[in-house]
Swiss-Prot record:
NCBIfam families per the UniProt record, alphabetical: DNA_bind_WhiA (TIGR00647)
Protein name listed in UniProt: Probable cell division protein WhiA
Family: Belongs to the WhiA family.
Gene Ontology biological process terms, A to Z: cell division; regulation of sporulation
Taxonomic placement: Bacteria, Bacillati, Bacillota, Bacilli, Lactobacillales
InterPro entries membership: Homing_endonucl (IPR027434), Sporu_reg_WhiA_N_dom (IPR018478), Sporulation_regulator_WhiA (IPR003802), Sporulation_regulator_WhiA_C (IPR023054), WhiA_LAGLIDADG_dom (IPR039518)
Pfam entry (one): LAGLIDADG_WhiA
Gene: whiA
Residues annotated to bind DNA: 272-303
Record has Cell division as a keyword: yes
Length: 303
């Protein structure tokens, strides 16, 4: 599973969003058609779970029953494309979400109310990412988050919305549309917090810290750095076990004293056992830290 898919699947397991989220989804992945002299709405995605999420969203909000269709792509990836197809109540949905002007090319940016309200902005960013967002796998060491828009003014409004949350968002125009993007790891982690993907934010940060620790090892050129590398190397097994726990039962399932040690070990892979002991809110002995780390390793081994 790609990191992008992981983020999106975390988002759809949160409580159902509001009209601002749905407006962003439809604006970025929806299209209008005309059949039997009435409008129909098609919303496309390559993720079956997202298709079911959109289906339920529309069904609950408008008491209408859409249809889910799919077809196979003919390119090398051969992914299925799922379409949430709405035949009834399309005019009501467009009016309620203030999208009619957008589809007819009259107003392709973001509603001023969304840009001025933080809660509306968070919901809109969540919907935009679900519809047209991607994150480069943090394991690559090259950090990039992108959201694709058909219209440049929408991409620029997205950047403005992100900048409201102190993110260094930029836009670039392509022949087929425009992209709003983030390139700093800290901005991407903050974006994940803004849209509610807390678990993926923790995973992203853990991977980033591990990469930085490995890079520190590779740059070890003197005795002092070599000692740090030795400490980091010794802590890798525990850090990997902590990540395993985060990905399965969640760090919050551990007793608080184990959570504190685990968080410190991931945040500071270069810390010696004594430094971990000293950094705790209520300092304990080295043997106490070792005892807790052994408990963490055993929990991970038993998973």
């Amino acid at each position: 599973m790609s990191f992008t898919t992981k983020v999106k699947e975390e988002l759809i397991h949160l409580s159902t969003g509001d009209n601002n989220e749905l407006a962003a989804i439809i604006k970025l992945s929806g299209s209008l058609g005309l059949a039997h002299q009435s409008l129909h709405l098609s919303i496309t995605t390559e993720n079956a779970k997202i298709a079911r999420y959109i289906y339920s969203f529309i069904e609950d909000a408008y008491v209408i029953v859409p249809e889910i269709r799919y077809h196979q792509k003919t390119n090398l990836r051969k992914n299925r494309v799922y379409t949430v197809y709405v035949e009834q109540g399309v005019e009501t949905i467009l009016a309620d979400l203030k999208l009619a002007d957008s589809f007819f090319g009259l107003e392709t940016g973001i509603e001023p109310q969304v840009l001025s309200d933080d809660n509306a902005g968070r919901s809109y960013l969540k919907g935009a990412f679900l519809a047209a967002g991607s994150i480069r796998d943090p394991e690559s060491g090259k950090y990039q988050l992108e959201i694709y828009s058909v219209y440049l003014d929408h991409a620029q409004d997205l950047a403005q919305l992100m900048q409201k949350f102190m993110l260094d968002a930029k836009t670039i125009e392509h022949k087929s549309g425009a992209v709003t993007y983030l390139q700093k790891a800290e901005d991407i982690m903050d974006f994940l917090i803004i849209i509610g993907a807390m678990s993926c934010k923790e995973d992203f940060e853990a991977i980033k810290l591990l990469r930085e620790a490995r890079n520190d090892i590779n740059r070890a050129n003197n005795a002092e750095t070599a000692n740090i590398a030795k400490t980091i190397s010794a802590s890798m097994k525990t850090i990997n076990n902590i990540i395993k726990i985060m990905d399965t039962i969640g760090l919050e399932s551990l007793p608080i004293e184990l959570q504190q040690v685990a968080q410190l070990r991931v945040k500071h892979p270069d810390y010696s056992i004594q430094q971990v002991a000293d950094a705790l809110e209520f300092p304990i002995t080295k043997s106490g830290v070792n005892h807790r780390l052994r408990k963490i390793n055993k929990i991970a081994d038993d998973l």
